[in-house]
């Protein structure tokens, strides 16, 4: 049994040896020969490029697998000349600049331990520089000096802890301030949005003189278009230039209760032409009046103070304020004092509300009875009893 096992072991060993030292077959050797030929061509090409670029003499001597000699350059005379010159050099010059593979590997193995030791020293020095654990100067310190050093280190440690707490607290306060500022900005933004929404719901009322009614206009309509303008002013409400008036109250509304009425008013060529309803709706140029209240309004009590049946109550003047406009003194405080009227023409119009006659060159009328009301006919006579 043992003999059989030993024989089998020897057989396997011999078989392995035969397999390990087996000569390469012809196919394998041919591939290697092909690879060698390609490598030789590459080496010869590089030698040629090197000789051209560096302008030097280059020689390559190579023996093939079959012992055949191949050189570059192919001219054998040039190869022999280069080899002769190289042989004439001394041993030192021959070794100069030459590289031997065996020597190169030995040098690399010799340098590696030195480099490793340098790296280890560098690694050991870095922690000592960053975090020194001991100083050689402490070796000669006494116990008292070492205790003082410990106390100094403790004081510095306490100071650093206080500083750290102060920095952390300051950062917390800054964070709270930033949070408060952000909340305030958010509240302001919400407030502005609420105000804007509220303004969109608010509307304004405008009096329309054309149809005598209020019209409701949202403020948002005006705010959305800043360039949008209001409707043009009707011609009947326009105030022409060169008018000096202290007060226009009542010119578009109900009669006021002005104290002065018209004082010392010079009226030149005031034309009331073809007025269907009231007086002409334009104020004469170069007219001076302290108060225009109740020019277009009705009497406060709604009664017709004039006995002219052609005048409706809506065109009556406020006799308490401007009753003297046509030369009639009302019950106002001042009426018309020292009033000169020149060429005041109420052109014969078809209206049944105003005065349908002309009054030309009335003399100066000094008011003495301020509590009387006069009604004049077409000749300028008073038709109302005093």
From Swiss-Prot:
Lineage top rank: taxon: Eukaryota
Domain MADS-box intervals: 29-76
GO biological process: positive regulation of transcription by RNA polymerase II
Pfam families: SRF-TF
Subcellular location: Nucleus
Keyword check for Mitochondrion: no
Keywords noted in UniProt: DNA-binding, Nucleus, Transcription, Transcription regulation
Gene3D superfamilies: Transcription factor, MADS-box (3.40.1810.10)
The protein's role, per its UniProt record: Probable transcription factor that may function in the maintenance of the proper function of the central cell in pollen tube attraction.
Name the record gives this protein: Agamous-like MADS-box protein AGL103
Annotated organism of origin: Arabidopsis thaliana (Mouse-ear cress)
Source organism phylogeny: Eukaryota, Viridiplantae, Streptophyta, Embryophyta, Tracheophyta
Gene label: AGL103
């Amino acid at each position: 049994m043992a003999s059989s096992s030993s024989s089998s072991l020897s057989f396997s060993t011999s078989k392995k040896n035969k397999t390990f030292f087996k000569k390469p077959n012809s196919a394998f050797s041919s591939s290697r020969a092909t690879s060698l030929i390609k490598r030789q061509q590459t080496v010869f090409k590089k030698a040629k490029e090197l000789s051209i670029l560096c302008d030097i003499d280059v020689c390559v001597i190579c023996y093939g697998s079959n012992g055949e000699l191949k050189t570059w350059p192919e001219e054998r005379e040039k190869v022999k000349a280069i080899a002769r010159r190289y042989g004439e050099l001394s041993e030192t010059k021959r070794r100069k600049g030459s590289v031997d593979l065996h020597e190169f590997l030995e040098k690399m193995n010799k340098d590696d331990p030195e480099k490793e030791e340098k790296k280890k020293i560098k690694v050991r020095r870095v922690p000592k520089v960053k975090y020194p654990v001991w100083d050689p100067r402490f070796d000669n310190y006494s116990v008292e000096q070492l205790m003082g050093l410990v106390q100094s280190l403790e004081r510095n440690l306490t100071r650093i802890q206080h500083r750290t707490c102060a920095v952390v607290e300051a950062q917390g306060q800054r964070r709270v301030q930033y949070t408060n500022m952000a909340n305030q900005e958010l509240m302001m933004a919400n407030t502005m949005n609420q105000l804007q929404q509220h303004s969109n719901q608010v509307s304004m009322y405008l009096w329309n003189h054309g149809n005598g009614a209020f019209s409701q206009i949202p403020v948002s309509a005006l705010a959305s278009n800043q360039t949008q303008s209001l409707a043009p002013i009707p011609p009947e409400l326009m105030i022409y230039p060169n008018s000096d008036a202290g007060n226009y109250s009542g010119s578009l509304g109900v009669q006021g209760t002005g104290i002065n009425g018209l004082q010392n008013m010079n009226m030149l060529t005031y034309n009331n032409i073809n007025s269907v309803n009231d007086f002409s709706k334009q104020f004469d140029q170069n007219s001076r009046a302290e108060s225009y209240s109740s020019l277009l309004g009705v009497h406060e009590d709604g009664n017709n103070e004039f006995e002219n049946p052609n005048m409706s109550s809506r065109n009556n003047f406020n006799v308490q304020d401007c009753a003297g406009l046509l030369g009639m003194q009302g019950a106002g405080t001042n009426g018309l004092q020292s009033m000169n009227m020149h060429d005041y023409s109420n052109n014969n119009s078809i209206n049944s509300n105003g005065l349908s006659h002309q009054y030309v060159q009335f003399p100066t009328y000094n008011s003495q009875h301020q509590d009387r009301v006069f009604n004049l006919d077409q000749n300028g006579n008073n038709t109302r009893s005093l």
